[in-house]
Amino acid sequence: LAGTEASGLYESRLGREELPEKENHVFCAAYRADEFEKLLQYADHIVFNSPSQLAKFGPAAKAAGKSIGLRINPECSTQEGHEIYDPCAPGSRLGTTRAQWDAAVAAHPELPALLDGLHFHTLCEQDADALAVTLAAVEKKFADLLPRMQWLNFGGGHHITRPGYALDTLESCILSVRQKYGVQVYLEPGEAW
């Protein structure tokens, strides 16, 4: 494992304590101002859910030397039976759509300079075929941003350790993105841990 993914201050602290030499990534739908400075002590990568959170906390994270990401919403649902957890469902506030990003950049042209990576998390106990569909949607909506990024996080929900999981499809997705855009690829294989 290259590191941990946390959802807030206390998980990030635990990740730093238990795996001190590994990367510590944090995503939170909304960071709290009263905790953010402490979070900077533990996190290496900080992923924001929205352009407004990026604008509010991104400069402090960048000044602290953190790698900064934005959770994107490719608006491509692959869910069946897990719709309640689907971040791509209509009305979802998880991740930033392309239209939201474009509107935010028009109002705040300094935002793109803060970003080092993009993060999507759209799967729930799914096979690599769903990842391939989602990745195609990510490229359709966000491909022009990827060459400027250092990394792309494919998120969690990959059922990698399930018998029959299409590892060749996963490998193909990773290699394709690395070759096209020159980015490091992250996965969050939660059930494998």
Where in this protein do the model-derived segments appear?
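Active-site-proximal beta-alpha core segment in soluble small-molecule metabolic enzymes
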Residues: L1-W151, C173-S176, K180-Y181
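Metal-dependent catalytic neighborhoods of phosphoester/phosphodiester hydrolases
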Residues: P163-T169
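Charged (often Lys/Glu-rich) extended helix/loop segments that serve as interaction or gating elements
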Residues: C173, Q184-W193
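Glycine-rich beta-strand-to-loop/alpha-helix junction loops that act as flexible
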Residues: T122-L123, W151-T161, P189-E191
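Short acidic/glycine-rich loop or secondary-structure boundary segments that cap or lie
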Residues: Q79, R162-P163, W193
